[in-house]
């Protein structure tokens, strides 16, 4: 999360993690998730600079996602829960980076587009509940073979990318500005590769619903903030102007986190959602 959006850094470069304050390379014992932060009281051992609470929170969230995947898939079905866990970790990375930088790393989105068909080919159960995968499979009725899962994965990527490109084109034509970033397009394409075309549409619907709620709350926050700042400066600001400020400032939210949430929900709960969707 820290490295991917920064120029000159990658997952493998530098080879070892460094203190964000003094740049000292961290030993393996200082890199144990959660435990190292607790033992060191949230500070660097070299310069004593405070290490953000965000690090252990993200590590705990990732552990929780893996636990959820194992629980829902069943410990015995390790290929399925391992694939789910990797996807969920990628979505967590995309979410945090998009919140910070309003961009989604290609390592996550394009990497997911490459990984999705390979994973579905090896673990057809990833597409096991999608009607398209069942229809395209030559196996027993209701079952999914490798070919069906692979074709459904490609269809999911096409639908995921296509629908967002269409929305972006329509938005640009209507509003005269970019309505959808390519990072979001690539992320939903990658997600569609794991959850199929129907899953991609459901994930987008969930993302739009949650994003709308958060967008309204964010605009309300800016409306209240605008009014309170005006009062603090002894100025009178009309409600109309406060509404314009709220609309302009509050509508800018990264869409990637909401897409990640939608994809994650569909990935883990497609059985229940497909019944409601159909």
Report the location of each language-model feature.
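A membrane-topology feature that recognizes alpha-helical transmembrane segments
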Residues: 1-278
């Amino acid at each position: 999360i820290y490295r991917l959006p920064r120029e000159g850094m990658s997952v493998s470069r530098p080879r070892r993690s460094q203190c964000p304050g003094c740049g000292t390379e961290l030993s393996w014992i200082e890199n144990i998730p959660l435990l190292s932060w607790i033992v060191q009281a949230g500070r660097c051992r070299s310069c004593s600079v405070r290490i953000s609470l965000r690090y252990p929170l993200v590590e705990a969230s990732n552990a929780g996602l893996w636990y959820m995947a194992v629980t829902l898939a069943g410990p015995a079905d390790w290929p399925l829960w391992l694939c789910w866990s990797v996807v969920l970790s990628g979505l967590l990375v995309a979410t945090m980076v998009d919140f910070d930088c309003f961009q989604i790393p290609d390592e996550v989105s394009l990497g997911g587009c490459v990984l999705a068909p390979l994973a579905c080919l090896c673990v057809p159960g990833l597409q096991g509940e999608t009607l398209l995968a069942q229809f395209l499979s030559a196996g027993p009725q209701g079952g999914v073979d490798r070919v069906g899962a692979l074709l459904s994965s490609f269809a999911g990527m096409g639908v995921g990318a296509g629908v967002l490109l269409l929305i972006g084109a329509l938005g640009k034509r209507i509003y005269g500005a970019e309505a959808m970033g390519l990072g979001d397009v690539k992320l939903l394409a990658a997600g569609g590769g794991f959850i199929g075309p129907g899953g991609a549409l459901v994930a987008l619907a969930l993302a739009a619903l949650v994003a709308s709620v958060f967008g309204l709350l964010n605009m309300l926050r800016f409306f209240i903030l605008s009014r309170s700042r005006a009062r603090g400066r002894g100025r009178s600001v009309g409600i109309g102007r406060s509404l314009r400020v709220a609309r302009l400032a509050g509508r800018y939210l990264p869409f990637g986190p909401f897409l990640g949430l939608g994809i994650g929900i569909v990935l883990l709960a497609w059985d229940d959602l497909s019944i409601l969707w159909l």
